[in-house]
């Protein structure tokens, strides 16, 4: 699956549905058995497609040279949705995702009876071809990477505060730290004067494609509007550039204008919008 995502994210690709870093965040931030629901498509020994269902939605990941399998993937996702629901007869919603700029998938979903909802994510990109400015944190705060398992409890606490309600737990975070793409030097935190964690981000580095993804990014409500988000993003961008990355990506939830302002303030530009399309089965 990682080889497929490397091909999907290759230089010259348009907006990307999932990088190797996204895969690690999705997989290790979920229940361990969730990946077992994914269905795979091969041509010979080459993996060319993955449909990963969860609840009432499905993520479709397709090799750029084999987009013709997506109709089969959608049909499978609909059958799997019905099978998971069991007998009952009620209408079942199923959501699939497509970028505005992904004309083939948009046309496919329309042909299968899907309609675009208002739910979407904004996909942002930033080149790393110029030096990254430094932005110091306010006096009394410090910015550093996590230092191992001793940081798990406060790291979980700030995540839960920033994204309440949240399923994040110490067990989940410990599992996340074992993900293949996870690097402690790219798991950044801002520590407040009282030693509590105030802001955080994880940067996932795809060395093959020289790109980085920020997921997640957050600030404790008690420490917002102090420039901590900008400072930690700039530090993540700086570290990516030192590793040889050429591009950084980040997503924000549609309608989250505070996140939009934050990301554009450090040089990210909106590339596309990834909409949920829904069908009642």
Predicted regions and their residues:
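Phosphate-binding active sites in nucleotide-utilizing proteins
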Residues: 162-208, 217, 221, 230
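Conserved active-site tyrosine of GNAT-family acetyltransferases
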Residues: 105, 109, 263, 268
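Short glycine/proline-centered loop/turn elements that form peptide/ligand docking sites
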Residues: 173, 233, 256-259, 278-281
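Acyl-donor-binding surface of acyltransferase catalytic domains
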Residues: 47, 54-139, 275-279
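Conserved donor-binding loop and adjoining core beta-sheet/short helix segment
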Residues: 5-87, 95-98, 193, 198-211, ...
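Conserved hydrophobic beta-strand within the GNAT/NAT acetyltransferase core sheet
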Residues: 94-97, 214, 248-252
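Short amphipathic alpha-helix that is part of the acyltransferase structural core
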Residues: 1-23, 134-168, 196
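Conserved acetyl-CoA-binding loop-helix of GNAT-fold acetyltransferases
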Residues: 67-83, 219-221, 225-242, 247, ...
């Amino acid at each position: 699956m990682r080889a497929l995502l490397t091909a999907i994210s290759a230089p010259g690709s348009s907006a990307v549905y999932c990088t190797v870093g996204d895969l690690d965040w999705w997989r290790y931030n979920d229940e361990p058995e969730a990946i077992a629901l994914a269905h795979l498509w091969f041509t010979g020994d080459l993996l060319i497609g993955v449909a990963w269902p969860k609840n009432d939605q499905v993520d479709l990941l397709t090799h750029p040279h084999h987009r013709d399998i997506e109709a089969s993937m959608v049909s499978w996702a609909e059958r799997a949705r019905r099978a998971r629901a069991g007998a009952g007869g009620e209408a079942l919603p199923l959501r699939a995702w497509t970028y505005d700029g992904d004309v083939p998938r948009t046309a496919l979903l329309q042909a299968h009876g899907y309609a675009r909802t208002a739910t979407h994510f904004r996909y942002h990109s930033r080149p790393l071809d110029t030096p990254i400015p430094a932005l110091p944190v306010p006096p009394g705060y410090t910015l550093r990477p996590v230092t191992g398992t001793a940081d798990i409890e406060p790291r979980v606490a700030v995540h839960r505060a920033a994204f309440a309600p949240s399923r994040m737990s110490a067990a989940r975070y410990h599992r996340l730290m074992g993900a293949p793409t996870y690097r402690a030097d790219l798991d950044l935190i801002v520590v407040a004067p009282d030693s509590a964690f105030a802001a955080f981000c994880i940067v996932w580095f795809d060395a093959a494609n020289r790109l980085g993804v920020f997921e997640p990014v957050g600030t404790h409500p008690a420490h917002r509007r102090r420039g901590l988000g900008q400072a930690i993003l700039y530090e993540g961008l700086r570290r990516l550039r030192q590793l040889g990355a050429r591009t950084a990506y980040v997503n924000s939830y549609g309608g989250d204008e505070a996140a939009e302002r934050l990301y554009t303030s450090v040089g990210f530009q909106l590339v596309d919008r990834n909409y949920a399309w829904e069908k009642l089965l």
